[in-house]
Amino acid sequence: ADRELHRSKA
């Protein structure tokens, strides 16, 4: 889940 990682970085 790459999108999950990006959301966590936000």
Curated annotation (Swiss-Prot):
Keywords: Cell wall, Secreted. It is found in: Secreted, Cell wall. One of its GO terms (cellular component) is extracellular region. The keyword Secreted applies. It comes from the Eukaryota. This is 36 kDa cell wall protein.
